[in-house]
């Protein structure tokens, strides 16, 4: 137990105690603005809010004073213009302060990360596991596993618990007090992990970096114990497959697990012995897979329930943890339906004058495209109806024909690009058909003609031109031993940039 406490003890010698004054430094907001322009995170122009992108300490000070005075919260129901104006100001306050919070709150973690590797050689494959390690895991090791534990990370976390966890890293009371006030003030505008609605979409979009940081910090708290178990037990040594995704790593801080491990710790470690245990996560969903027995997975499930209950004061619902056998169930992860299927084959073995026929079943990874959810997403975006019948896109009829073709082509290429790792690409033909015919109907509606006459006048080449690019890219990657069409439909190609288009369901 003492060894565990020494491991969980923080190195407080490098903590920065004074972060509140940084809120009034103009360069902090310049960094936030540059980050929005260079890190490929959507950043709306401040001209929308009648603001000229010039930050100053005086403006920030006024915003903080107004927040504390709460004058902007007095909304008159009879005055709709006053209500719109106050909501407009609330958006401006939240965006400016959250941008400052996002930059400042990352400083202690960034300093600790840099200082921890001073004079040391960084082992990138171990310490900076990313989503890219998931692809070789699926191809090389996933087929040898038997059971999988689907985990939905617990949410929503209470805002006070989130601030208390940050207190272990940041000791500036003024900064934490303002952060607590800010979170409580705007928690109705956006939840850290729940689905986005129309009324909080603006808040999430304009403050994405800040809330991604808070969400990643919460996720780190929920899975940090795996770091300790991996270091203490050689049974959890699969570092190439233990991938803490989202690249947000905070080292050295784990505490309050004494309640879970209040008994003999070595005995508890023995309960989780498994030489083939793997853990990986993407966003709010994580997977634990094992070659062991269902009893072992049940032990891990009970452990996670106790961890969430004692550490996060969260009562876990039964639907957040599912134990499935890979041979009988599909794994819904990264937008794919993955499963392990035995692939029987016959081998003829010749030994001197005797010949033997051996039946061998080799496990094969199947990654299937979820067609029904994709069609539902297309229907939600008004590309087709719920039965998959293509319809025109009325919202795009005011655009030029070239822009319409480019939009449809970009969506179609993104779908092909994202699901290039599928083992059955022919299932995407229905999605491509919906997009092609929807594009044709939109163009025909734009020119006030029928689809038949439009296709007869222009031909079908204009529908093919935005589908060729993806096939050309694959033709350069794959060997040219066989026909390109057969090759493209059978080969799995994992692109490292698919997380950029993981919001594939948001096609509008």
UniProtKB/Swiss-Prot annotation:
A matching Pfam family: Intron_maturas2
A GO CC term attached to the entry: chloroplast
Compartment(s): Plastid, Chloroplast
Keywords of the record: Chloroplast, mRNA processing, Plastid, RNA-binding, tRNA processing
An example Gene Ontology molecular-function term: RNA binding
GO BP of this protein: mRNA processing; RNA splicing; tRNA processing
InterPro entries in the record: Domain_X (IPR024937), Maturase_MatK (IPR002866), Maturase_MatK_N (IPR024942)
Record keyword Plastid present: yes
Keyword Heme found: no
Family of this protein: Belongs to the intron maturase 2 family. MatK subfamily.
HAMAP family named in the record: MatK
Task performed by this protein: Usually encoded in the trnK tRNA gene intron. Probably assists in splicing its own and other chloroplast group II introns.
Protein name: Maturase K
